[in-house]
Curated annotation (Swiss-Prot):
The lineage of its organism: Bacteria, Pseudomonadati, Pseudomonadota, Betaproteobacteria, Burkholderiales. It catalyses: tRNA(Pro) + L-proline + ATP = L-prolyl-tRNA(Pro) + AMP + diphosphate. It comes from Burkholderia cenocepacia (strain HI2424). Keywords: Aminoacyl-tRNA synthetase, ATP-binding, Cytoplasm, Ligase, Nucleotide-binding, Protein biosynthesis. This is Proline--tRNA ligase. Catalyzes the attachment of proline to tRNA(Pro) in a two-step reaction: proline is first activated by ATP to form Pro-AMP and then transferred to the acceptor end of tRNA(Pro). As ProRS can inadvertently accommodate and process non-cognate amino acids such as alanine and cysteine, to avoid such errors it has two additional distinct editing activities against alanine. One activity is designated as 'pretransfer' editing and involves the tRNA(Pro)-independent hydrolysis of activated Ala-AMP.
C-alpha cells in the first residue's frame, strides 16, 4: 500500500466528548468518525484492524468446528414474544413498525432467530451437535452511549450458538468455545483473563466472561496471582474471614454515639477496628395484599453488599431496598442506627459468613445516637441465617484455597454461556432422541465484541505518542519512511525495493510516499500505532544502513540495508508466533 493512495485522516486534537484514551486515539488516528450518539463510520485505518480481528476470530471458530451463516439484523417481534424477551429486554431493544403495522426489532442478539432455524431444520439427535456463528452488525439502544466503541449503540459482534442433545454434549461444545476464545485473545496479543460470571439478561446457568486487563475497565475482577482462579467481583465466592467464632469476652452494653451514623465514625469514636462493626442493610420483598417482608442483612463494617448474590437467596429474588418509612415502622428509628437487637417489629436476619463467626461486635441500637457494643450470637441474638452476601475484596482468601485475592479492572470483550433449555423450551425447539421421544435442545451462546476489542486493545497499549498495536491487529505491520522519496533516486529505489521484498514476504507494509516532512510522517505513524518503522535516508544508505525502530523501542537501531526487510519480517513472524 502506498500512502499517497490511501486515506490517512489523523487529527492533532481529540473531540471534546472523548473521555477515555481509546476514544481519543481512535478519532485522532483516523479510525472512526461519529455519525450519531454511539454510531460511527469506520474509516480505512480502522476497518483494516477490524478485518484482522474478524479474520482471527473466523479462523478459530472454524478450527473449533463452528459453521458460519448470516442472520438478518431485522427480526420480527413474534420471535421475541415467543421467548418472552419482548417484555423483558427493556428500552435497549430498538423496536419499530413496518408499513403494514407489523412490529420488528433491530437485533442486539440472535438467540430467537437461531432457535427458529434450529427448530425448523434440526429434527433428530443425529443432526447434533451443531454450532452456528456469524459476524454481524448489532444495535442496542444504550441510554447513554459513551467511550467511543466501548459503549456504542451500533457495533460488530461475532455470535455463535450451539445445539446439543444432552448435558455432556453441551459441556463439550462449551469447552471447545472456551478454548477457542483463549486462542483468539492470545493471538490478538492481549493480556486477558477468563472469569466466572453472572449470566445477566441473556439468561442461562453457567458462564464465563473474557476481560482485557486495563485500568479504565468498567468491571472489577477478583483473581488469585498464584493460581488460575478469576471471577467477576459480583460472582466471586466470599469465604468467611474468621475460621471459628471466639467465645464472648465482653458484656453487651449500650453506648452513646452522637452523630456517628457510619461504621467508620463509630469505630473511630469507640477506638476499635472497623472490622468489629456491623453494617445493617434493610431490604423488603412485597407480598400481594399484605405488608412486605422486611429483611436485615448484616455485613462487616468494611464490606459491601452484593445484590446479585442476595437475589439468588430463597425469597429474595425480587427484593428492593426498604423505604425510610418502612425502616421507621419496623425499627423505630431512621437509617444510621439500625441493628438486630430489639426491633419494633419482627424482621428476618441474614448474616454474611464473616459476620456469623464474629464475637463482641457493635451494632446499631435502633435509637438515634446510640449503638450496642459487645454483642454475641447465641447469647444476645439467636443464631442467624447465614449466606454469602458480600463482594470479595483484596486480601480475601481465594476460593480455590491457593492464595489470596487481588482486584484488577477489566473490559469485557467476550462472553460464553450455557443456556440449557431456556430458549428451546420457550420456542418449542425439540428433536427426537434415540428412543424416538421429543426432547428440548440444549443451547450455548458465545459472543465476541469485534469493534470493542479495538478499544480494549488501545486501552492496554498506548503511550503519549499514540496507539501501540499488537502486530496481529495493526492496520499495517511496517511503515517505510523515506527521506526525500520524490527528490533522491537512491532513497526512492531502496524504498521501492524494500517495499517489494516485504510484500513478497507476506508482510502488511505501507510506504509513505506523500512527501511530508519527517516530523509529520513519524507523528502520523506513531499515532496510528504501526509496530515497526524503517527510515530510509541518503546519509545512512551511503554507509549501507537503514534506521529501524519498533513502536515500543526507546531508541532506533541501524540495520544493514540489504537484509533489513528480512530482519523486520522475522521480527513480525516471531511476534505473531508468540
Amino acid at each position: 500500500m502506498k500512502a499517497s493512495r490511501f486515506f490517512i485522516g489523523t487529527l492533532k486534537e481529540a473531540p471534546a466528548d472523548a473521555e477515555i484514551v481509546s476514544h481519543k486515539l481512535m478519532v485522532r488516528a483516523g479510525m472512526i468518525r461519529r455519525v450519531a450518539g454511539g454510531i460511527y463510520n469506520y474509516l480505512p485505518v480502522g476497518l483494516r484492524s477490524i478485518r484482522k480481528v474478524e479474520a482471527i476470530v473466523r479462523e478459530e471458530m472454524n478450527r473449533a468446528g463452528a459453521i458460519e451463516l448470516l442472520m438478518p439484523a431485522v427480526q420480527p417481534a413474534e420471535l421475541w414474544q415467543e421467548s418472552g424477551r419482548w417484555e423483558q429486554y427493556g428500552p435497549e431493544l430498538l423496536r419499530f413498525k413496518d408499513r403494514k403495522d407489523n412490529d420488528f426489532v433491530i437485533g442486539p442478539t440472535h438467540e430467537e432467530v437461531v432457535t427458529d432455524i434450529a427448530r425448523n431444520q434440526i429434527k433428530s439427535y443425529r443432526q447434533m451437535p451443531v454450532n452456528f456463528y456469524q459476524i454481524q452488525t448489532k444495535f442496542r439502544d444504550e441510554i447513554r452511549p459513551r467511550f467511543g466503541v466501548m459503549r456504542g449503540r451500533e457495533f460488530i459482534m461475532k455470535d455463535a450458538y450451539s445445539f446439543d442433545k444432552d448435558a455432556a454434549g453441551l459441556n463439550e461444545s462449551y469447552r471447545k468455545m472456551y478454548d477457542a476464545y483463549v486462542r483468539i485473545f492470545t493471538r490478538l496479543g492481549l493480556e486477558f483473563r477468563a472469569v466466572a460470571a453472572d449470566s445477566g439478561s441473556i439468561g442461562g446457568n453457567f458462564s464465563h466472561e473474557f476481560h482485557v486487563i486495563a485500568d479504565t475497565g468498567e468491571d472489577a475482577i477478583a483473581y488469585c496471582p498464584t493460581s488460575e482462579f478469576a471471577a467477576n467481583v459480583e460472582a466471586a465466592e466470599a469465604l468467611p474471614l474468621i475460621a471459628e467464632r471466639a467465645a464472648p469476652a465482653e458484656a453487651m452494653e449500650k453506648v452513646a454515639t452522637p452523630g456517628k451514623a457510619k461504621c467508620e465514625a463509630v469505630a473511630e469514636l469507640l477506638s476499635i477496628p472497623l472490622e468489629r462493626t456491623i453494617k445493617s442493610i434493610v431490604l423488603a420483598t412485597d407480598n400481594e395484599g399484605a405488608e412486605p417482608t422486611i429483611w436485615l442483612v448484616m455485613l462487616r463494617g468494611d464490606h459491601d453488599l452484593n445484590e446479585i448474590k442476595v437475589s439468588k437467596l430463597p425469597g429474595l429474588k425480587n427484593h428492593r431496598f426498604a423505604t425510610e418509612q418502612e425502616i421507621v415502622e419496623w425499627f423505630g428509628t431512621p437509617p444510621g442506627y439500625l441493628g438486630p437487637v430489639g426491633t419494633k417489629k419482627p424482621v428476618k436476619v441474614i448474616a454474611d459468613r464473616t459476620v456469623a463467626n464474629m464475637s463482641d461486635f457493635v451494632v446499631g441500637a435502633n435509637e438515634v445516637d446510640y449503638h450496642i457494643a459487645g454483642v454475641n450470637w447465641g447469647r444476645d441474638l439467636p443464631e442467624p441465617e447465614v449466606a454469602d452476601v458480600r463482594n470479595v475484596k483484596k486480601g480475601d482468601p481465594s476460593p480455590d484455597g491457593k492464595g489470596v485475592i487481588d482486584i484488577c479492572r477489566g473490559i469485557e470483550v467476550g462472553h460464553v454461556f450455557q443456556l440449557g433449555t431456556k430458549y428451546s423450551e420457550a420456542m418449542g425447539a425439540t428433536f427426537l432422541d434415540e428412543s424416538g421421544k421429543p426432547q428440548p435442545m440444549l443451547m450455548g451462546c458465545y459472543g465476541v465484541g469485534i469493534t470493542r476489542i479495538l478499544g480494549a486493545a488501545i486501552e492496554q497499549n498506548f503511550d503519549d505518542k499514540g496507539i501501540i498495536w499488537p502486530e496481529s491487529i495493526a492496520p499495517f505491520e511496517v511503515v517505510l519512511c523515506p527521506m526525500g522519496y520524490d527528490r533522491s533516486d537512491m532513497v526512492r529505489e531502496t524504498a521501492d525495493k524494500l517495499y517489494a521484498e516485504l510484500v513478497a514476504a507476506g508482510i502488511d507494509v505501507i510506504l509513505d510516499d506523500r512527501g511530508e516532512r519527517p516530523g509529520v510522517m513519524f507523528a502520523d505513524w506513531e499515532l496510528i500505532g504501526v509496530p515497526h518503522r524503517l527510515v530510509i535516508g541518503e546519509r545512512g544508505l551511503k554507509e549501507g544502513k537503514i534506521e529501524y525502530q519498533g513502536r515500543r523501542d526507546a531508541e532506533a537501531t541501524l540495520l544493514p540495508a540489504d537484509t533489513a526487510a528480512a530482519a523486520v519480517a522475522e521480527k513480525i513472524r516471531a511476534a505473531l508466533a508468540h
